[in-house]
């Protein structure tokens, strides 16, 4: 739409009896009857190519640092910039003249930071009878220069550059087959990897009230997660939180390379002060970028924060279209839309045999921490793991504040799941005894029950809680988790010859401290094994054979 000489981007969201309803991705002040409208005939799309990593985009894929240079502090409407940096790349061809190609096939590669960036045939190319007519030799070329020409049996020719365009609401399906997500995505957070695992190519959601630690948890997953690329979609979060992400991510050190985490990260931010429709687009933009890097054989982790704001954007658009409202005025198709977004996650086998994945983790911000509201319920039906943060645990400073009893996961973890279930049953029984003790007090509780309660508290404090600001305890490798859980499991399963409550409390307090000291030792160092031996000797001194 042309308004005051500026072209505002919009998307047609409904056509009814010759009347098109348009959603504008900018502030729509000043639009009047008679303003000219241009139809491009294209779907809402993003540009994909080398140079996307390290960038910060808005929901429409405008690079925000470049926009800031051009517009100053406040973004002007109608300003759109190229998302792909204007530069040359060192291209190496991987096909030759006469080779058959189809959608999603690689025609060459360029080095991008830590990765080899595959240059691919557009995913939207139709037909399988295309052949390479000409391809450039190895050398340095501009990102938008033609590097390959392909033609089909009808004589149609298509010029290809390093940049391809992909509609954001169409999933990329250029792969051999989808696989079952069975390999754990290691986050090095004990409570997630052992008790509530996430799989590569799986989905998980993190609902929780404000201030429960969702953002720090996301930082830890981004920093220590076993993913090649991390994409953060901050859609509709408060501007303050987005600023925090933008400030902290470049400072976070990537433990794998020792360089900045930003080198393998893309951030897409649409704060709650930006227009509503662009907020809806930002989730789809993020997942399209994730699928693009998946096609190169990489494992991608997409963190969407927060899907509640995205659903609220849908609610506003649905209201303007005068559609029949569902529960809490959300549209009736809320569930299917959320499901279609999470279904774009997955582990796939590509045509060249590589296994790659997109893992989607969405945070949900239910009003007042009420998990019964429609967005949380619709999300729970489609995700494979639920990490519910609780206000009660964050107030008690038990971090990460994932509630071990309310949360669940359908995936397999890094520790033997049968043992984890036994440990979880101790946690449940300990919690029941704790509830009973609040009524009858310690005096009315038997020594046996009191020991079970203390075992539950021990498991919670030494294994489920983790200090993300401690250089050693912040990241706990799978081997270390198995080792520590093995010792803790034996201590939990042992029977203790203790009758006096004060003696029981003193014993478990000391055992807890020994475990916490163990967390501070370097894995497989002499101190690590010495502390392990000390713990075993200490609990066996009171255990009954």
Q: Residues of each region from the PLM?
A:
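P-loop NTPase catalytic core
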Residues: 194-195, 201-514, 524
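C-terminal amphipathic alpha-helical interaction region
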Residues: 499-545
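Metallocofactor- and cofactor-centric catalytic cores in central/energy metabolism, strongly enriched
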Residues: 8, 18-20, 42, 125, ...
């Amino acid at each position: 739409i042309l308004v005051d000489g500026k072209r505002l981007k919009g998307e047609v969201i409904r056509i009814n009896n010759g009347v098109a309803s348009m959603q504008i991705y900018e502030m729509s002040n000043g639009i009047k009857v008679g303003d000219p409208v241009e139809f491009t005939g294209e779907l809402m799309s993003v540009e994909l190519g080398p140079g996307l990593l390290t960038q910060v985009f808005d929901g429409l894929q405008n690079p925000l640092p470049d926009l800031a240079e051009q517009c100053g502090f406040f973004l002007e409407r109608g300003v759109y910039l190229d998302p792909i940096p204007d530069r040359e790349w060192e291209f190496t061809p991987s096909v030759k003249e006469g080779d058959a190609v189809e959608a999603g096939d690689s025609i060459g590669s360029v080095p991008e930071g830590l990765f080899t960036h595959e240059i691919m045939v557009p995913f939207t190319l139709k037909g399988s009878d295309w052949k390479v007519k000409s391809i450039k030799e190895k050398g340095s070329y501009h990102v938008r220069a033609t590097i390959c020409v392909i033609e089909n049996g009808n004589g149609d020719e298509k010029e290809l550059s390093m940049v391809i365009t992909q509609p954001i609401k169409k999933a990329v399906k250029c792969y051999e087959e989808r696989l079952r997500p069975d390999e754990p995505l290691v986050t090095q957070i004990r409570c997630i990897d052992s008790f509530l695992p996430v799989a590569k190519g799986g989905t998980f959601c993190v609902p929780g009230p404000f201030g429960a630690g969702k953002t720090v948890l996301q930082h830890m997953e981004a920093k220590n997660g076993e993913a090649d690329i991390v994409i953060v979609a901050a859609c509709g979060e408060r501007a303050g939180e987005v600023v925090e992400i933008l400030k902290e991510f470049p400072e976070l050190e990537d433990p794998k390379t020792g360089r900045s985490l930003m080198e393998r990260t893309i951030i897409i931010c649409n704060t709650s002060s930006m227009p509503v429709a662009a907020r809806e687009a930002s989730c789809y933009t993020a997942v399209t970028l994730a699928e693009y890097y998946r096609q190169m054989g990489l494992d991608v982790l997409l963190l969407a924060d927060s899907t509640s704001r995205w659903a609220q954007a849908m609610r506003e658009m649905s209201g303007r279209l005068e559609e029949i409202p569902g529960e809490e005025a959300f549209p009736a198709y809320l569930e299917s839309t959320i499901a279609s977004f999470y279904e774009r996650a997955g582990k796939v086998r590509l045509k060249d045999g590589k296994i790659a994945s997109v893992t989607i983790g969405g945070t949900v911000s239910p009003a007042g921490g009420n998990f019964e509201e429609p967005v949380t319920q619709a999300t729970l039906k489609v995700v494979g793991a639920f990490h519910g943060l609780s206000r009660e645990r964050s107030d008690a400073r038990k971090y990460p504040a994932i509630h071990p009893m309310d949360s669940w996961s359908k995936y397999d973890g890094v520790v033997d799941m049968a043992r984890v279930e036994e440990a979880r049953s101790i946690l449940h029984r300990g919690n029941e005894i704790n509830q009973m003790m609040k009524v009858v007090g310690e005096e009315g509780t038997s020594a046996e029950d009191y020991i079970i309660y203390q075992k539950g508290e021990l498991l919670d404090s030494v294994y489920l809680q983790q200090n993300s600001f401690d250089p050693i305890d912040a990241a706990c490798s799978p081997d270390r988790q198995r080792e520590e859980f093995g010792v803790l499991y034996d201590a939990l399963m042992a029977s203790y010859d203790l009758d006096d409550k004060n003696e029981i409390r003193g014993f478990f307090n000391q055992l807890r401290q020994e475990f916490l000291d163990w967390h501070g030792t370097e894995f497989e160092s002499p101190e690590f094994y010495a502390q392990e031996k000390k713990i075993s000797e200490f609990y066996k001194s009171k255990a009954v054979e």
